[in-house]
Amino acid sequence: MINAIRTPDQRFSNLDQYPFSPNYLDDLPGYPGLRAHYLDEGNSDAEDVFLCLHGEPTWSYLYRKMIPVFAESGARVIAPDFFGFGKSDKPVDEEDYTFEFHRNFLLALIERLDLRNITLVVQDWGGFLGLTLPMADPSRFKRLIIMNACLMTDPVTQPAFSAFVTQPADGFTAWKYDLVTPSDLRLDQFMKRWAPTLTEAEASAYAAPFPDTSYQAGVRKFPKMVAQRDQACIDISTEAISFWQNDWNGQTFMAIGMKDKLLGPDVMYPMKALINGCPEPLEIADAGHFVQEFGEQVAREALKHFAETE
């Protein structure tokens, strides 16, 4: 049994711009004793489903500006919190967090909720993991919205990931340092540094799931998993590259936060070349790493693109 802790509910009281009702699963196969949280908004009987995957060090709060737009279109919107994040349980041992631990959770969630006609919405680790999902069951996936994300493979052979891991010191090196080094990580301060457009209330909401460092094992582990990729991650991600190049026939929309020092245009344009049929991206000049902070614009532009090209 995995040793995990649960963020007290009162930490999530009266969060700014987060009026959504919680949903939980506590019996997913392979995760005994762990309770997972997800949002389930919009029309529960809709044919189309938007599956919105957050990254590091965020949670479903990241999609607060996109969920209403997707829901207004008549679709169902699912936004899970990875284990270690948001309202989901948080294993306290960093060793419990692996690429397959997170990926298999997403696959189990999709199967349990029987999600179909999925528009996959990804950014950061939501992309590292999410971009490996469609090849597992392509019939479930219909469209892709990708924002500042890539696949973690071999940087020698893949330009997108190479651009990510070979950045100047103010890129991934600084990001990892800010998350891994502090003995008392203040995630509200971290978010304000990397997303300066945030209000104090928004930054505090991002930090709500993490009352102290004992809740932050998942946050600390993600950057280490980039620096030291396990073989399963490399193998699965390499297989996914072939899928997106050769087998993907769905609609795609790409948005790039142009100020991102991690997964900005140097990463995203090689990703565009990798994804079959990917159109010219929406470049958002003022957006950094957390593109979803400009999410209403991205969501509306994506829906418009899908309607015009369907």
From Swiss-Prot:
Domain of life where this protein originates: Bacteria
GO function terms (MF aspect): epoxide hydrolase activity; haloalkane dehalogenase activity
Catalyses which reaction(s): 1-haloalkane + H2O = a halide anion + a primary alcohol + H(+); 1,2-dichloroethane + H2O = 2-chloroethanol + chloride + H(+)
InterPro entries the UniProt entry points to: AB_hydrolase_1 (IPR000073), AB_hydrolase_fold (IPR029058), Epox_hydrolase-like (IPR000639), Haloalkane_dehalogenase (IPR051340), Haloalkane_dehalogenase_1 (IPR023489)
Residues spanning the signal sequence: none
Keywords, comma-separated and alphabetical: Detoxification, Hydrolase
GO biological process, one term: 1,2-dichloroethane catabolic process
Gene3D superfamilies reported in the protein's UniProt record: alpha/beta hydrolase (3.40.50.1820)
E.C. number: 3.8.1.5
Active site: D124, D260, H289
SUPFAM superfamilies xrefs: alpha/beta-Hydrolases
Pathway given in the UniProt record: Xenobiotic degradation; 1,2-dichloroethane degradation; glycolate from 1,2-dichloroethane: step 1/4
All residue ranges annotated as the AB hydrolase-1 domain in the record: 49-295
Thermal properties: Optimum temperature is 37 degrees Celsius.
pH dependence: Optimum pH is 8.2.
Means of activity regulation: Inhibited by thiol reagents such as p-chloromercuribenzoate and iodoacetamide.
Binding site for chloride: W125, W175
Subunit organization: Monomer.
Record function comment: Catalyzes hydrolytic cleavage of carbon-halogen bonds in halogenated aliphatic compounds, leading to the formation of the corresponding primary alcohols, halide ions and protons. Has a broad substrate specificity, which includes terminally mono- and di- chlorinated and brominated alkanes (up to C4 only). The highest activity was found with 1,2-dichloroethane, 1,3-dichloropropane, and 1,2-dibromoethane.
PANTHER family assigned to the protein according to its UniProt record, in alphabetical order: AB HYDROLASE-1 DOMAIN-CONTAINING PROTEIN (PTHR42977:SF3), HYDROLASE-RELATED (PTHR42977)
Family: Belongs to the haloalkane dehalogenase family. Type 1 subfamily.
HAMAP family found in the cross-reference section: Haloalk_dehal_type1
Name of the protein in question: Haloalkane dehalogenase
Annotated source species: Xanthobacter autotrophicus
